[in-house]
Amino acid sequence: MTELPIDENTPRILIVEDEPKLGQLLIDYLRAASYAPTLISHGDQVLPYVRQTPPDLILLDLMLPGTDGLTLCREIRRFSDIPIVMVTAKIEEIDRLLGLEIGADDYICKPYSPREVVARVKTILRRCKPQRELQQQDAESPLIIDEGRFQASWRGKMLDLTPAEFRLLKTLSHEPGKVFSREQLLNHLYDDYRVVTDRTIDSHIKNLRRKLESLDAEQSFIRAVYGVGYRWEADACRIV
């Protein structure tokens, strides 16, 4: 295995390739493009490495000594959504791989241009970055909303909410910073045509805020925007 010292903010690319010259060529091009490549030449070394040091993207050759690329891709997908680019020597093999739906993000056929590989890497990382940031933000959210059970918790502590309070909490916390008018909140709260007043929302918000602050007095949760409505001040919720 060939691994080079990297800056922690540099995207890490795992190259799984058993041809030394081709592997070194990819290392050179990826380093020149400001990536941090690591080369593994034997299939049996891949899973332990990925579990211990997850890369940002994997270039995975199909034919390898030890565990083959097809099996590795399937196994990695069992525990990770790391972008995977499969590399094959046969263009007709790509159709078969697509049909198997193994979970790869892209496919490259040998012989290829190293510049093409770098371009694919850039495109895939750019595409995956917003999604991964959202997932990371979700995983760190202190507010968990369980739609199926109609339950919500803040930092592991359950909130005792009415159905109306639950809907308001979900609506506001799903879009932090967005100001919702009372009319918008009423529309989210009631899907029928019952006659209610703006004061109904104010009453529900008051009760919801009180319950939240009883769990965390230091956190600002819901702020009133004079003449407009309300906005969520804390982190976005995680909906499960």
From Swiss-Prot:
<dbReference type="InterPro" id="IPR016032">
    <property type="entry name" value="Sig_transdc_resp-reg_C-effctor"/>
</dbReference>
<dbReference type="GO" id="GO:0005829">
    <property type="term" value="C:cytosol"/>
</dbReference>
<keyword id="KW-0902">Two-component regulatory system</keyword>
<comment type="function">
    <text>Member of the two-component regulatory system BaeS/BaeR. Activates the mdtABCD operon.</text>
</comment>
<dbReference type="GO" id="GO:0032993">
    <property type="term" value="C:protein-DNA complex"/>
</dbReference>
<dbReference type="Pfam" id="PF00072">
    <property type="entry name" value="Response_reg"/>
</dbReference>
<feature type="DNA-binding region" description="OmpR/PhoB-type">
    <location>
        <begin position="131"/>
        <end position="234"/>
    </location>
</feature>
<dbReference type="GO" id="GO:0000156">
    <property type="term" value="F:phosphorelay response regulator activity"/>
</dbReference>
<keyword id="KW-0804">Transcription</keyword>
<keyword id="KW-0805">Transcription regulation</keyword>
<keyword id="KW-0963">Cytoplasm</keyword>
<feature type="modified residue" description="4-aspartylphosphate">
    <location>
        <position position="61"/>
    </location>
</feature>
<protein>
    <recommendedName>
        <fullName>Transcriptional regulatory protein BaeR</fullName>
    </recommendedName>
</protein>
<keyword id="KW-0597">Phosphoprotein</keyword>
<keyword id="KW-0238">DNA-binding</keyword>
<dbReference type="GO" id="GO:0000976">
    <property type="term" value="F:transcription cis-regulatory region binding"/>
</dbReference>
<feature type="domain" description="Response regulatory">
    <location>
        <begin position="12"/>
        <end position="125"/>
    </location>
</feature>
<dbReference type="InterPro" id="IPR001789">
    <property type="entry name" value="Sig_transdc_resp-reg_receiver"/>
</dbReference>
<dbReference type="Pfam" id="PF00486">
    <property type="entry name" value="Trans_reg_C"/>
</dbReference>
<dbReference type="InterPro" id="IPR011006">
    <property type="entry name" value="CheY-like_superfamily"/>
</dbReference>
<dbReference type="InterPro" id="IPR036388">
    <property type="entry name" value="WH-like_DNA-bd_sf"/>
</dbReference>
<dbReference type="InterPro" id="IPR001867">
    <property type="entry name" value="OmpR/PhoB-type_DNA-bd"/>
</dbReference>
<dbReference type="GO" id="GO:0006355">
    <property type="term" value="P:regulation of DNA-templated transcription"/>
</dbReference>
<dbReference type="InterPro" id="IPR039420">
    <property type="entry name" value="WalR-like"/>
</dbReference>
